[in-house]
């Protein structure tokens, strides 16, 4: 019995002793680490950079792209979320653990990962983004900052933040354009005499680019560049990360180009509508013009107010010209059709008036009476209390069958003996009698000038061929408008897609 109990209690006691020893060892370990950190910071001057007064401090830069959030053409900037890691060495932070800190299993403490609060107690680079507009450090659930300290004094200082960076875009070929946006990393206060920045592993210093995507752009390539900024305060090392972006055209095809093409084609429908259907053709033309105006305003609202012409401006303006030309085409058809009828009607009226005037003149010569020629205008006679018994008037109907009143009235000649005083005495007051003036009153010099200008005008007058059938204009328009639009599209897409 005792042979079983004694060994059991002995084993239990040994386990308890081992646990106590290990717990004491862990306590000593934590105390040693704390003492080591405290000893590192004791007498540490945060104001001085490592190797102060000696060679420039080399700081390696590493960028991990987390997301490419947005690009704004209006504000000329873009927003990204990234991890920025900085590597340097500070001999003042070297540490050596005691042998008692060996944790067994071939593991020993050679690094310490500390929170971002430790960065406020040591010297860190004053790195900033030269083209930054607005940035913020993520703090969920804690500030996204860390410091990793190695035994030889090497440090890794990392942080995660979102930044909006300026990107000056060239929109001449918009939306068939390529853009280059950069991340400019530089020391704010330390010149190259104190700090030298470099990309860690050159191109390998940037990762995560292949994993991000944008709705309107594709990242075709990226590059890292080292350059020197010469300012009045000194020469500064600057690291540039360049993103080469190509805009995706699919959105603009369905949002702008395809609707514009359909609107232009819709304006051609008026060429197949009867030219006498004025309301239909005018309404269709005005609707297409207003629709193109709406599309143009929508495109301009998403772009900055720049002075130069963009590729999409050229396309929209040409589409507007095509729909406006279709409306003007109907104006030409309508004027040709109704204007020709009006001219023929006026010509017939003039011929009839000339005929009547000739018959009246012939009748006067046969009667051999001295009369004044009265203009063929309506003469209003104001009757008084005393009338003339022999007064007669008659109307000549010059209607050509169209239902329009010509407005001509022929009044019989007035004898010379019927003077103004005699007419007033007998109650007749002619109110609108216009006597013909002889052209001899015009000075000879003016007549010569007028004759000279008439001859010049005839010599430079452009002869427009008469269109006998207005449908001919529509027939030519049905062919020429689509042909010209196809030529324009072929030239447009060839130029901008190749460039």
Swiss-Prot record:
MF terms (GO), sorted A to Z: chloride channel activity; extracellular ligand-gated monoatomic ion channel activity; GABA-A receptor activity
Cytoplasmic face of the membrane: 334-475
Disulfide bridge map: 167-181
Quaternary organization: Generally pentameric. There are five types of GABA(A) receptor chains: alpha, beta, gamma, delta, and rho.
Name of the protein in question: Gamma-aminobutyric acid receptor subunit beta
Compartments, record wording: Postsynaptic cell membrane; Cell membrane
Main localization category: membrane
PROSITE patterns xref list: NEUROTR_ION_CHANNEL
Glycosites: 32, 98, 106, 152
KW Transmembrane (keyword) present: yes
Membrane topology listed for this record: Multi-pass membrane protein
One Pfam family per UniProt: Neur_chan_LBD
Record family assignment: Belongs to the ligand-gated ion channel (TC 1.A.9) family. Gamma-aminobutyric acid receptor (TC 1.A.9.5) subfamily.
CDD domains hit by this protein: LGIC_ECD_GABAAR_LCCH3-like, LGIC_TM_anion
Signal sequence region: 1-23
Key word Transferase present: no
Recorded superkingdom: Eukaryota
Any one annotated GO CC term: chloride channel complex
Alphabetically ordered keywords of this record: Cell membrane, Chloride, Chloride channel, Disulfide bond, Glycoprotein, Ion channel, Ion transport, Ligand-gated ion channel, Membrane, Postsynaptic cell membrane, Receptor, Signal, Synapse, Transmembrane, Transmembrane helix, Transport
Extracellular compartment spans: 24-251
């Amino acid at each position: 019995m005792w042979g079983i109990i004694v060994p059991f209690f002995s084993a239990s006691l040994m386990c308890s002793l081992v646990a106590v020893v290990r717990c004491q060892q862990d306590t000593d370990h934590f105390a040693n680490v704390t003492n080591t950190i405290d000893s590192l910071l004791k007498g540490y001057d945060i104001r001085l950079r490592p190797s102060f007064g000696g060679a420039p401090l080399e700081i390696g830069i590493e960028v991990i792209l987390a997301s490419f959030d947005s690009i704004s053409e209006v504000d000329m900037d873009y927003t990204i979320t990234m991890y920025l890691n900085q590597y340097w060495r500070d001999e003042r932070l070297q540490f050596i653990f005691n042998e008692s800190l060996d944790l067994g299993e071939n593991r020993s403490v050679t690094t310490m990962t500390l929170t971002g609060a430790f960065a406020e107690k040591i010297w860190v680079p004053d790195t900033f983004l030269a083209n930054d507009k607005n940035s913020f450090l993520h703090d969920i659930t804690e500030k996204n900052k860390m410091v990793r300290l190695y035994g030889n004094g090497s440090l890794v200082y990392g942080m995660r933040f979102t930044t909006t960076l300026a990107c000056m875009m060239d929109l001449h070929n918009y939306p068939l354009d390529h853009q280059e946006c950069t991340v400019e990393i530089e020391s704010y206060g330390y010149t190259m005499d104190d700090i030298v920045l470099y990309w860690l592993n050159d191109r390998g210093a940037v990762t995560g680019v292949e994993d991000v995507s944008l709705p309107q752009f594709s990242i075709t390539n990226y590059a890292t560049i080292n350059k020197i900024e010469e300012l009045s305060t000194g020469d500064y090392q600057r690291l540039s990360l360049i993103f080469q972006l190509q805009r995706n055209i699919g959105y603009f095809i369905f949002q702008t180009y395809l609707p514009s093409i359909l609107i232009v084609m819709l304006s051609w429908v008026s060429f197949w509508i009867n030219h006498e259907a004025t309301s239909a053709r005018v309404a269709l033309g005005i609707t297409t013009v207003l629709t193109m105006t709406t599309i143009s305003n929508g495109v301009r609202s998403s772009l900055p107010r720049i002075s130069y012409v963009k590729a999409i401006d050229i396309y929209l303006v040409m589409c507007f010209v095509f729909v406006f030309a279709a409306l003007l085409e109907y104006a030409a058809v309508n004027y040709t059709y109704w204007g020709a009828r009006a001219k023929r009607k006026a010509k017939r009226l003039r011929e009839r008036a000339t005929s009547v005037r000739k018959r009246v003149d012939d009748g006067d010569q046969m009667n051999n009476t001295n009369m004044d020629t009265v203009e063929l205008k309506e003469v209003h006679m104001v009757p008084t209390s005393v009338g003339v018994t022999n007064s007669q008037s008659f109307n000549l109907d010059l209607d050509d069958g169209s239902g329009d009143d010509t407005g001509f009235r022929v009044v019989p000649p007035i004898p010379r003996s019927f003077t103004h005083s005699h007419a007033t005495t007998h109650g007749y007051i002619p109110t609108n009698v216009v006597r013909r003036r002889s052209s001899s009153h015009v000075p000879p010099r003016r007549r010569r000038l007028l004759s000279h200008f008439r001859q010049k005008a005839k010599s430079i007058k452009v002869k427009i061929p008469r269109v006998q059938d207005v449908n001919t204009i529509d027939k030519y328009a049905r062919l020429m408008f689509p042909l010209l639009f196809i030529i324009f599209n072929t030239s447009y897409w060839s130029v901008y897609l190749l460039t």
